[in-house]
Amino acid sequence: MLLNSNELEHIHSTNHSVNDISIRWGVIGAGQKGNKEADLFAGYKFSNGTTCYPTLAVNFAESDMMHLQNIIKEDRIHFDGLKGAARTPSVVTDLFDPETNPNANGYLDKLAQELGRKFTNEEGEVIVDQFLICLGAGGGVGTGWGSLVLQLIREQFFPCPVSMLISLPSGDPDEINNALVLLSEIDEFMREQDRLFGNSDIKPLANVIVNDNTQMQRIIESQKGTKDLKNRYVNWKEVANDNVVSTLHEINIIPENYGSDNVTYDPSDLIKLLSIPGRFLTIGKARIAKFDLHSLENSIKRSLDEGFFSAEHQFETATMYGGFVLRPSNADFFKDVNTENRIRNTLGEYKRLDEIAGKFGDPIWDNEYAVCYTIFAGMTMPKRYISLAREGKELAEKQEQLRAEAQRKQDEEKVDISFATNRVQKNTFNPYNKNQGFGGASRFSGGKNSAFKRQTSEATSTQNQQEEENIISTLKTSNPFKKR
């Protein structure tokens, strides 16, 4: 059983049984980043030992999945003959595009069969409420998979709504470009979805949750050496994954397993919040050890502005909110009217709560501190999109300047090697040729070739033919994943 947060350690160290969740996520991790997050979801188990989330990993580089600890080999989807996408999303999208690949439907059939095997029961019934797609926007497989998912939603491939968990890159121009294009495509999809579905309809693309690598690395660097991160060596990516995934798991198990003597936050409240808005969603998580209004307010603000889900969100565009304070049973501070008002007023600084739907509860647990989980949903594109575009442009301009400068220096320092070329071209000695004599036709007739030219043979290209013939092209009729 994976216990990768203080809260999960405490929950499972007590006699409190956890045998259900609010939303039955079917988790699919695409690309190296998505694989690692999905692997964490696969490690969560109920008190009875059964797995919380059915999970698949998808990757074009089989080696990227070798070190997964919780996803078994048969649940690691790899397409034969492919060895990665090299930060080129079109490798993914072209594979499933009938206009560019005549075998695209065969690949889609294989994907549908794998999803049907994992996410349906023996009667062919879907066993999940939502699909949670984890990916890194920037890599080839992750970015391409994000684009592919949008197209498959349009084709009604998925039998239930889809949520996306996306991490944004930092520092690499190619990855930033990929992320910007994917975010733009998501924004276009959301606008189209808004035209087709009403405010109270469950959306095919339920929500998109964004994590910013730059922000998460900054948090972990500031925490290194503190009581939260005592280790001498810290892999910030692993710590970030633990924080993001454990927070999502916590908000999913608490409403189902913890009640309140004041205001209960039901599983149905969470399901509604994560199903209807159809836009960007963010989560704030704040541990509260000092029970006073000032500490409470600052903790909530810090979790939203400087947390692991912070990405310069436009809170004023939110259409729903929700959350709860997981509090000690003897902490009457959280039931006090002034405390309730302070929480509402603090959230109201981000978005006037009387303008949007939502609910805030206060479930009880048997620990000494409290944890506040805050969710805003239905927001438009985060402003991080704008600043990321600015960073990408600056990096591209810097790269071009460096290339031009290097070319200029090379031109200035050009070396005359004509003497060497002349000597090499006149050298006719070959130790592997037998001496055939010096008579006969002129030895200098014919066209001139490079002195280093090698004998070449015609290449053949039949590598993928047999592999493509082995792909399953039909599905069982009970499979709910729609074929083209």
UniProtKB/Swiss-Prot annotation:
The lineage of its organism: Bacteria, Bacillati, Bacillota, Bacilli, Bacillales. Keywords: Cytoplasm, GTP-binding, Hydrolase, Magnesium, Metal-binding, Nucleotide-binding, Plasmid, Plasmid partition. A miniplasmid containing this and upstream gene tubR is able to replicate in B.thuringiensis subsp. israelensis and express insect toxin proteins. The miniplasmid could be used to make plasmids for insect toxin overexpression. This is Tubulin-like protein TubZ. GO terms for molecular function: GTP binding; GTPase activity; identical protein binding; metal ion binding. Belongs to the FtsZ family. TubZ subfamily. Disulfide bonds: none annotated. Residues 428-484 are annotated as: Disordered. The gene is tubZ.
